[in-house]
Amino acid sequence: MERLNWHIAQELSRYAQVRVLGPKGSASLAPEEVAIDEATSEKMGPFLLQAFLRCLRIARRWRPDIIMAGSGLTAPIAVIVARFIGARAVVYAHGLDLTVDHAVYRRVWLPLVARADTVIVNSSATRELALRAGVRSDRLRIVHPGVELPANSEPGDLQDLAEFRRKHDLGPGKLLISVGRLTPRKGILEFVRDVLPGIVARVPHCTLVIVGDAPVHALAAASQSVESIQAVARQASVAANIRFLGKITDDELSMVYGIANLHVFPVQLRPNDPEGFGMVAIEAAARGVATVAYRVGGVPDAVAENQSGRLINPGDSSGFASAAIALLERPLDADAIAAFAQRFSWDRVGKQLAEALGADAQE
């Protein structure tokens, strides 16, 4: 989320003067063209109060035309302060911020989201969630998040990639990758239990490379911990086909994409925990790596059927395995996959955001 808002600020600064109010530490990470103010409280309640007061003070002095909330959580601040000074209020909603199962949030936050002059959503699925939350259709705009595109989709130096394989004991076989936090929504445990055995039966020397760590301080984290996934893998007789890399650097992630044969994205259908978009599928596509995913939430906006991957009906584990096997045996064209990702370049997304805000998007 922080990286997304960083890019939004950077892109909008090409079309307008931009000032950002962010959490503690954000000033050191700000784009050069963007002024940053901070709300330094670390606890949620004090942070929101401090952010509201600072936003109001800045808005009275600076008189912006638009006040934009980077998520539903800060929507009340944007909407209320905008009304105080006569500015337009804009909210960028991501999915989960429209479905949170919390009485106060649904009673206070969602009505204020619906009162924004414009609500930008990250996918077609999130648009439907916004409509159910009471947002008028004429106030909705879909702008998918952008992705940092590599200079080309070539995998990288072959010697470096071979060394990376050896270092992490990835073997010579086909590599499936999963990139993201080990949350219940991402469905890695279910994939290892229900899908991977079918793939291994047909492609016995393949390896699932899992990038990402388990979230801390989350009630459901244990259900998708490394230990629980390993236990399921042993029960399914696929423990030898899994490697955990944990949290890695951007350079190491580029290596992972460089050696990957397929990206798997087995997101689960969870009504109060939707997948708003599926940025990792675009990041994989930018490197010429196809994705197999369940057709849930905003994922269909991030995977082009038979161009950048395959979409499978939720819960169809045998269909998921069959699609993965087919793409491992007969890969899609890497250049066509990468061409799909070009639609999500930050340059294009910046223009779409500017147009959604009513700014002049002409260079």
Where are these regions (language model features)?
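N-terminal subdomain of nucleotide-sugar transferases
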Residues: M1-A27, E32
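Short His-centered aromatic/hydrophobic patch
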Residues: A69-A75
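Carbohydrate-associated surface elements
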Residues: A125, G146
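Conserved donor-binding/catalytic core segment of Leloir-type glycosyltransferases
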Residues: Q159, L170-K186, V192, L196-P197, ...
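Nucleotide-activated donor-binding/catalytic signature segment of Leloir-type glycosyltransferases, i.e.
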Residues: G212, A222-E252
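Acidic donor-binding loop of glycosyltransferase active sites
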Residues: N241, K247, G258-D273, V289
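Short hydrophobic beta-strand element within catalytic cores of glycosyltransferases
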Residues: A281-A286, A290-A293, V303
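Conserved acidic donor-binding segment of nucleotide-sugar-dependent glycosyltransferases
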Residues: E305-N306, R310-S317, I325-P331
